[in-house]
């Protein structure tokens, strides 16, 4: 990592590149949550809002519809584990989670 101060701040490019390097080293991870939103788009992509099962936190995950098809049909608020890889786009400072596998583990407790 690098050291910064008000006298020696890090340029945006250095910070965004450091975030990208860290996330690239992290590799794919398994994430558990409840699907609170599911939007299937034309073009083969789907976007999932994954909500924590015990805290008021959520995360956006994108996947190909073929990945989603392996667990269809999903009941409302399905509880799932998702194998995903985080990617950081340095130009825009955007974090994207891309699902490679989804497994249903039960029906969640989220009430709409």
Set out the residue ranges of the language-model regions.
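Acidic, two-metal ion nucleic-acid-processing modules in DNA metabolism proteins
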Residues: 1-112
């Amino acid at each position: 990592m690098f050291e910064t101060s008000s006298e020696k701040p890090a340029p945006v490019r250095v910070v965004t590149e450091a975030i990208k390097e860290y996330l690239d080293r992290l590799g794919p991870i398994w994430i558990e949550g409840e699907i609170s939103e599911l939007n299937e788009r034309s073009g083969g992509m789907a976007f999932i809002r994954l909500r924590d099962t015990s805290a008021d936190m959520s995360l956006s995950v994108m996947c190909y519809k073929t990945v989603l098809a392996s667990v269809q049909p999903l009941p409302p608020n399905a509880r799932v584990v998702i194998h995903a890889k985080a990617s950081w786009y340095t130009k825009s400072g955007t974090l994207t989670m891309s699902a490679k596998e989804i497994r249903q583990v039960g029906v969640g407790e989220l009430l709409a």
